[in-house]
From Swiss-Prot:
Belongs to the RNA polymerase alpha chain family. It comes from the Bacteria. GO terms for molecular function: DNA binding; DNA-directed RNA polymerase activity; protein dimerization activity. InterPro entries: DNA-dir_RNA_pol_insert, DNA-dir_RNA_pol_RpoA/D/Rpb3, DNA-dir_RpoA, RBP11-like, RNAP_asu_C, RNApol_insert_sf. GO terms for biological process: DNA-templated transcription. This is DNA-directed RNA polymerase subunit alpha. It comes from Rhodopseudomonas palustris (strain BisB18). The keyword Cell membrane does not apply. Residues 251-339 are annotated as: Alpha C-terminal domain (alpha-CTD). It catalyses: RNA(n) + a ribonucleoside 5'-triphosphate = RNA(n+1) + diphosphate. Pfam families: RNA_pol_A_bac (PF01000), RNA_pol_A_CTD (PF03118), RNA_pol_L (PF01193). The N-terminal domain is essential for RNAP assembly and basal transcription, whereas the C-terminal domain is involved in interaction with transcriptional regulators and with upstream promoter elements. Transmembrane segments: none annotated. Homodimer. The RNAP catalytic core consists of 2 alpha, 1 beta, 1 beta' and 1 omega subunit. When a sigma factor is associated with the core the holoenzyme is formed, which can initiate transcription.
Length: 339
């Protein structure tokens, strides 16, 4: 037995379906199927943990408010205490290009509300939730705040954001660097051919807009790939690459696909098998009337088959010249990557 069979003979997802949410930059659902039984939980849990803990992002590390010495202060004419202001600052979502730290400033006079959109940023820093309310100013009140923004990953508590030489009045802030806000997943059974207990992994992801959900999953998968490489203690045998000559066919290569690879109900699949219909090329030449004469084959099965064929651009009652070819089994193997 060759070592490659350990991974080459496992079923792998043949597609990753991404369904955008109401805001495609922030919300999406991703579906991967089919997976070997148990792999849905394995991959879903691993990806979720990496998504929430290991992706790089940007966040406010500290703030300096003019006239304020510490976070337990209050500011004349400002309705919120400094503690509440700092809690609001934690929720500012930021996208930053390049390396930090960077500076942002907000200066405003009352009356009115100070929002994240009032912050003056440099060109490579973008505030992603400008409607976020930071504080409320009364008539005649004024506030000026200077923020330090840096890059990082995961969650960093305020105590770790305080530099050793921090000046008086510098208030460290809890930093949530991860651009991913929420991740959930579920695993369901799915069907591949006649096997009904493969896994289907569905992941629902919300980001802060600094990265799209599908890119976030791609980066998380790349992190896992990189971390797992150290466990591979062998070199794979090199495969001789030969240029395969693909013969010209007088018919659609899809006709060489076996009908048991279609996602048909057990009843429909058994009817085709009992009627010795092996390949799609056998099936499409049948008329609707011929199919309905098949024992135990009813209108429901007919509609199911017509729908599956339509998805492939095919239909019943087709003429297939040169069918069946003499070397049909050999051709089916050679063309299995072409339909």
């Amino acid at each position: 037995m060759t070592i490659q069979k350990n991974w080459q003979e496992l079923i792998r997802p043949n597609k990753l379906v991404v369904t955008p949410g109401s805001d495609p930059t922030r919300f999406a659902t991703l579906v991967a199927e089919p997976l070997e039984r148990g792999f849905g939980q394995t991959l879903g849990n691993a990806l979720r943990r990496v998504l929430l803990s290991s992706l790089q992002g940007a966040a406010v590390q500290s703030v300096h408010i003019d006239g304020v010495l510490h976070e337990f202060s209050s500011i004349a004419g400002v309705r919120e205490d400094v503690t509440d202001i700092v809690l609001n600052i934690k929720d500012i979502s930021i996208k930053m290009q390049g390396e930090g730290p960077k500076r942002m400033v907000v200066k405003k006079q009352g009356p009115g509300t100070v929002t994240a959109g009032d912050i003056q940023t440099v060109g490579d820093v973008v505030v992603l939730n400008p409607d976020l309310q930071i504080c409320t100013l009364d008539e005649g009140a004024e506030i000026r705040m200077e923020f330090t923004v840096a890059g990082g990953k995961g969650y960093v508590a305020a105590e770790r954001n305080r530099p050793e030489d921090a000046p008086i009045g510098l208030i460290p802030v809890d930093s949530l660097f991860s651009p991913v806000r929420k991740v959930s997943y579920k695993v369901e059974n799915t069907r591949e051919g006649q096997i009904l207990d493969y896994d289907k992994l569905t992941m629902t992801i919300e980001t802060n807009g600094a990265i799209s959900p599908d890119d976030a999953v791609a980066y998380a998968a790349r992190i896992l790939q990189d971390q797992l490489n150290v466990f591979v203690n062998f070199e794979e045998p090199r495969k001789e690459v030969t240029q395969e000559i693909i013969p010209d066919l007088a018919f659609n290569p899809a006709f060489l696909k076996k009908v048991d690879e279609l996602e048909l109900s057990v009843r429909s699949a058994n009817c085709l098998k009992n009627d010795n219909i092996v390949y799609i090329g056998d099936l499409v030449q049948k008329s609707e009337a011929e199919m309905l004469r098949t024992p135990n084959f009813g209108r429901k099965s007919l509609n199911e088959i017509k729908e599956v064929l339509a998805q492939m651009g095919l239909h019943l009652g087709m003429e297939v010249p040169g069918w069946p070819p003499e070397n049909i089994d050999e051709l089916a193997k050679r063309f299995e990557d072409h339909y």
